[in-house]
Curated annotation (Swiss-Prot):
Residues 50-143 form the 2Fe-2S ferredoxin-type domain. GO terms for biological process: aerobic respiration; respiratory electron transport chain; tricarboxylic acid cycle. Its cofactor is [2Fe-2S] cluster; [3Fe-4S] cluster; [4Fe-4S] cluster. GO terms for molecular function: 2 iron, 2 sulfur cluster binding; 3 iron, 4 sulfur cluster binding; 4 iron, 4 sulfur cluster binding; electron transfer activity; metal ion binding; succinate dehydrogenase (quinone) activity; ubiquinone binding. This is Succinate dehydrogenase [ubiquinone] iron-sulfur subunit, mitochondrial. Its main location: mitochondrion. Keywords: 2Fe-2S, 3Fe-4S, 4Fe-4S, Electron transport, Iron, Iron-sulfur, Membrane, Metal-binding, Mitochondrion, Mitochondrion inner membrane, Oxidoreductase, Transit peptide, Transport, Tricarboxylic acid cycle. Component of complex II composed of four subunits: the flavoprotein (FP) SDHA, iron-sulfur protein (IP) SDHB, and a cytochrome b560 composed of SDHC and SDHD.
Length: 290
């Protein structure tokens, strides 16, 4: 009865008027369905082969030299991100391929690498659908390589540790007894700074850091230094500035701005460094007048 009201038979979607008239169902509909199914099957069967040229080097192999190795991946059977392709290659094509990865959602920074000429996160970088182009993947530039796509971040983390990235209070009598509260306005000053995930994409895209990586702290670390300098709960702003007075730690920045262009979180390390330089000028004036 319900089918009659709607005017459509529940059997194969045939209009009810044909059934009431005693007419046979139109077989053309079945033919159309068959054609559609065939087209879908043919489309699925057509492979979309994408080539990935990946940096390889294994220090545990005597005489092994850095080289590029090409892998082919069917994009119809792969997720949309470069990290999906790397995982597929490791799981199905070459288990020796080595890279870092963890969260797969742009939060941890583990999968930072150089993809198609730019530093970014493999988990948030979409695969270029142009099958005629080979996607080239390298470890982060100008860093020692542990193996394949794994850079040695020891110096980077040592520099981060050197800025003492935590709250420092001159009066610690209330430590552990109550919260150090902030106003909404003071808290908002930290926006665009605290979101840094320390992936090192910005620092390793900076020519100044390539040239003076042992002395220049680099954009990532300097942005974090600024984050603690302007935190209203911190009492060591002047001491933090004094730590950066030498010619290299801060002043090797020449506002090339590669750092801001490449940041996968959309942050602006170059602006943070400029703000530190402004604070440094005021600090030096105070020190000279004292």
């Amino acid at each position: 009865m319900a089918a009659a009201v709607v005017g459509v038979s529940l059997r194969r979607g045939v209009p009810a008027r044909f059934l009431r008239a005693g007419l046979r169902p139109v077989r053309g509909l079945e033919a159309v369905h068959g054609i559609c199914r065939g087209a879908q099957t043919a489309a699925a069967a057509t492979s979309r082969i994408k080539k990935f040229s990946i940096y390889r080097w294994d220090p545990d192999k005597p005489g092994d030299k850095p080289r590029m190795q090409t892998y082919e991946v069917d994009l119809n059977k792969c997720g949309p991100m470069v990290l999906d392709a790397l995982i597929k290659i490791k799981n199905e094509l070459d288990s020796t391929l080595t890279f870092r990865r963890s969260c797969r959602e742009g939060i941890c920074g583990s999968c930072a690498m150089n993809i198609a000429g730019g530093n970014t996160l493999a988990c948030t970088k979409k695969i270029d659908p142009d099958l005629s182009k080979t996607t080239k993947i390298y470890p982060l530039p100008h860093m020692y390589v542990v193996k394949d796509l794994v850079p040695d971040l020891s110096n980077f983390y040592a520099q981060y540790k050197s800025i003492e990235p935590y709250l420092k209070k001159k009066d610690e009598s209330k430590q552990g007894k109550e919260q150090y509260l902030q106003s909404i306005e003071d808290r908002q000053k930290l926006d665009g700074l605290y979101e840094c995930i320390l992936c090192a994409c910005c620092s390793t895209s900076c020519p100044s850091y390539w040239w003076n990586g042992d002395k220049y702290l680099g954009p990532a670390v300097l942005m974090q230094a600024y984050r603690w300098m302007i935190d209203s709960r911190d009492d060591y702003t002047e001491e933090r500035l004094a730590q950066l007075q030498d010619p290299f730690s801060l002043y090797r920045c020449h506002t090339i701005m590669n750092c801001t262009r490449t940041c996968p979180k959309g942050l602006n390390p170059g602006k943070a460094i400029a703000e530190i330089k402004k604070m440094m000028a005021t600090y030096k004036e105070k020190a000279a007048a004292a």
